[in-house]
Amino acid sequence: MITNSQIIITKDIDLYLSELVPTLPLHTHRIFQNEEENKDNFKIEQAKKVIKEAYIASSESKYIILCGNKFELEAQNKLLKILEEPPKNIIFIIITTSKSNLLPTIISRLPHKYIKSLNKKEYSNHNIFKKDLKDIYLFLKENQRISKND
């Protein structure tokens, strides 16, 4: 389970979201993304809603999930302060397809990790108990996506 704010970089935002949500405690998360036709861009309107939601007090951890292939510059600037100093019990999860979609100042404020989402069909093809060490190693190498600089 995720215990601190972070940036998730994945090729398929919807698939990762479908894997993440069941791992979170029930009724503790809010997802913010552009619901318009071109829902790739995270806009200033979503940023304002995120800030408003973050300041609603909660005695338990609340996960605020921001999804977008691209984040408008104005939206990112609006979020800077709250990402740097989040209210008590607020955990931000930014999900995007590329690190370059975010300002360097946002990337410097939150840890980030690359996730290769596997669909259920891919999972079912790999029974770890029937694999030898070499096959497991090759599978892990094939699915690893971390650069030297990270």
How would you describe each model-predicted region?
Residues E72, L80-L83, L103, L110:
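CheY-like receiver
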Residues S59-I64, P87-I93:
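Loop/turn-to-beta-strand initiation segments
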Residues M1-N77, K81:
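Clamp-loader machinery-focused feature within the broader ASCE/P-loop NTPase space
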Residues M1-I31, K88-I91, T96-D150:
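Charged, glycine-rich active-site and insertion segments that engage polyanionic ligands
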